[in-house]
C-alpha cells in the first residue's frame, strides 16, 4: 500500500489495470512513456465538509497502468486554511513500496511562484518558476545549473492547457482534464495529462511530472476547476 507497507509484485489499481512492483532506478519507468495521467484522489471527509485535506494523487502511464503515487506531506492545518493555494508545500512522489522517486518543494510566495524538483537523493533535477507577464501564464523550467531549458506557456483562450516550449517549438503539453460529472459535482478534484517526446531522459520527464503539482496549486486549487 503506498505510504505504508510494501505491496505484492503486481496488483490492480482503481481502474482494474496493473500496478507494477519495480526494481532498479524507479525513475527509469518513465523511459518508455510519452504520456502521463495524474489523478487527484479526494478523501470523503473533504468532499463532505469542504475542508482541504492533504492532496493525494495517482500517476499512471498512457495504458492506465499505475506508475507512482504522490501526496502532500507536512504543513499545518492553519497554513492550509489561511494561505490555501499560496501555502508552502512538499509533495513526495513514491513507488508502491513507498520508495521516493522525486520530491517537489515549494516555498511561500505571493508572486513569482516556484518549486524545486529533487531526485531520491535530494539532488536538484530542475526548477519551475512563474514569470511576470501581464496576460499570459508563463513559467521557466531550469536545470540543476540554473540554465533555462524549457518554458511553459498558458494560452489566453485555453485556460486548462500549458504548452511545453523549447526554442519556440512545442514539445508537449500539460492539460487539466475534466474529472467527470459525478466527481465535479462533489469535489474540485484535479486531473492532469502530460505529453512529451518518448526519447526524453527520464529525469527530464520527471521535472514535468513535478511541474504539474505547482500548476495545480497556483491555478486550480480552491477554484472549482
Predicted feature locations:
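Low-complexity or membrane-interfacial segments used for flexible interactions
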Residues: 2-90, 96-99, 106-114, 120-125, ...
Amino acid at each position: 500500500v503506498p505510504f505504508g507497507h510494501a505491496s505484492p509484485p503486481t496488483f490492480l489499481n482503481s481502474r482494474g489495470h496493473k500496478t507494477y512492483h519495480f526494481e532498479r532506478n524507479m525513475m527509469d519507468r518513465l523511459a518508455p512513456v510519452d504520456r502521463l495521467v495524474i489523478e487527484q484522489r479526494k478523501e470523503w471527509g473533504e468532499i463532505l465538509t469542504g475542508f482541504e485535506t492533504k492532496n493525494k494523487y495517482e500517476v499512471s502511464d498512457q495504458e492506465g497502468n499505475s506508475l507512482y503515487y504522490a501526496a502532500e506531506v507536512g504543513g499545518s492545518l492553519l497554513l492550509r486554511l489561511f494561505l490555501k493555494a499560496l501555502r508552502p508545500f512538499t509533495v513526495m512522489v513514491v513507488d508502491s513500496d513507498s520508495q521516493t522517486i522525486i520530491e517537489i518543494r515549494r516555498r511561500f510566495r505571493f508572486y513569482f511562484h516556484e518549486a524545486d524538483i529533487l531526485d531520491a537523493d535530494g539532488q536538484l533535477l530542475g526548477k519551475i518558476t512563474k514569470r511576470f507577464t501581464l496576460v499570459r501564464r508563463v513559467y521557466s523550467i531550469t536545470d540543476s545549473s540554473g540554465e533555462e531549458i524549457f518554458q511553459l506557456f498558458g494560452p489566453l483562450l485555453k485556460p486548462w492547457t500549458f504548452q511545453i516550449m523549447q526554442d519556440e517549438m512545442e514539445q508537449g503539453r500539460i492539460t487539466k482534464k475534466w474529472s467527470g460529472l459525478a466527481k465535479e459535482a462533489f469535489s474540485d478534484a484535479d486531473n492532469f495529462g502530460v505529453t512529451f517526446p518518448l526519447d526524453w531522459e527520464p529525469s527530464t520527464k520527471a521535472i514535468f511530472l513535478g511541474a504539474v503539482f505547482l500548476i495545480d496549486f497556483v491555478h486550480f486549487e480552491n477554484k472549482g476547476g
